[in-house]
A protein has these predicted regions:
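Exposed, low-structure sequence patches enriched in small/polar residues
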Residues: 102, 153, 157-165, 169-173, ...
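A short acidic, glycine-rich active-site loop
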Residues: 76, 136-140, 302-304
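Beta-barrel outer-membrane channel/assembly domains of diderm bacteria
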Residues: 30-108, 333, 345-356, 360-368
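Sec-dependent signal peptide recognition
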Residues: 13-19
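N-terminal signal peptide c-region/cleavage motif recognized by signal peptidases
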Residues: 25-27
């Protein structure tokens, strides 16, 4: 714990020095300057009861994440942020279970946006099925390491992201994801979109010839309307292309169809996600040169998309609402899952709080 505290103090010291240096370097160029203290707090509880299932393990993910960061803005479109991402899982013997750097540049105007560096995943705007990212994976991977290019208007959005989450070394595989999400609305209530991901799961420094390619494509068509309740109904197609260059055998091409339904009012919602098709994670139990299965290190999606019976259904009942100009977000959900043989349960509770007090405003000379 002493080593971790020393590491934390050293990291904080370096961040403060870096921020001060950046403030000094940009001050001469700024038309207007503002300094904020962004603080994001997340409380997460995700309990899965999958006893008897071959698809997932019964476990509880329970903890908090704290991300304080200084944000320096100049002009109306540019900002630079630096801080730390700290995670503590309840019951852990460690002082902190994870600590990492947050540092990124952000550009934004009415329609276009860009982020470069290490930034919160919540800044992404895309719509992604849980076949791409499960709730547990998102809780454990809150930081994007790379680049995001974004476009939004009144009729839709588009986003391209590069997330480099593995550096080539003796301890870790080199790996990165390039993913896209785009959607457009038409005929008042209709929308069409597509999501795609290319995951390059490469080698470590101590072995080679064990690259895995994992591609997933999801075009969809939906309708969203109000009739006392808010309704969202979406039909999508999932096509995967995967190959393990170590095992050989060429490309595997599992696919399936997904129907999503949600109705909500006053924050209370009922949702259902019905998937019928192939096992989208055929390499899940394949063993790489580390001597262990690829598992969740390769696949970020919900493991129930590994269905052995060509069917997976997820029904959720819960409450989800934002308060205080969306600075406080709460969600509680009870989930029923079935693989066509048995019914399993999951409980999700999350609380997110964001505050951003202004520390300095050049136009006002000081923050009153």
């Amino acid at each position: 714990m002493t080593d971790l505290c020393v590491r934390m103090c050293e990291m904080v010291r370096k961040i403060v020095i870096s921020v001060v240096a950046l403030l000094l370097s940009f001050s001469a160029l700024a038309q207007s300057e503002r300094l904020y203290l962004d603080t994001d707090f997340d409380f997460d509880f995700d309990n899965t009861e999958y006893s008897g299932s071959n698809l997932g393990a019964s476990e509880t993910l329970f903890g908090i994440t704290l991300m304080p960061a200084l944000r320096y803005e100049w002009g109306d479109k540019h900002s630079l942020s630096a801080g730390v991402n700290m995670q503590k899982m309840f019951g852990s013997a460690r002082f902190l279970d994870d600590i990492d750097l947050i540092a990124y540049y952000q550009f934004r105007n009415e329609n276009y946006g860009a982020l470069a560096g290490l930034f919160r995943r919540e800044k992404l705007i895309g719509r992604y099925s849980e076949a791409f990212f499960s709730n547990a994976w998102l809780v454990d991977n809150r930081v994007v390491q790379g680049l995001s290019l974004q476009y939004t208007d009144k009729n839709g959005f588009a986003e391209l992201v590069v997330d480099w989450n593995g550096m080539y070394s003796a301890e870790r595989r080199e790996q990165f994801r390039i993913f896209f999400s785009g959607e457009g609305r038409f005929a008042k209530v209709m929308y069409a979109g597509a999501t795609a991901s290319m995951h390059h799961y490469a080698n470590r420094a101590d072995f080679c010839y064990n690259v895995v390619d994992d591609i997933l494509i999801n075009p969809y068509l939906g309708v969203a309307f109000k009739a006392f309740f808010d309704f969202d109904i979406r039909l999508g197609y999932l096509q995967s292309l995967q190959q393990d260059r170590l095992a050989g055998g060429g490309w595997q091409t599992p696919y399936g169809t997904e129907l999503f339904f949600r109705m909500s009012r006053w924050g209370v919602f009922i949702s259902n996600n019905f998937y019928i098709g192939d096992d989208l994670m055929p390499l899940y139990n394949s063993v790489g040169k580390e001597g262990i299965p690829y598992g969740a290190d390769l696949y970020a999606g919900d493991p129930f998309y590994r269905t052995e019976n060509a069917i997976y259904n997820r029904t959720g009942i819960g409450y989800e609402r934002n308060f205080w100009k969306e600075r406080i977000k709460v969600k509680a959900e009870f989930v029923l899952k079935t693989d066509g043989e048995r019914v399993y349960t999951q409980q999700i509770i999350s609380l997110g709080v964001n505050i951003a007090p202004k520390l300095y405003d050049k136009n006002n000379k000081r923050n009153k």
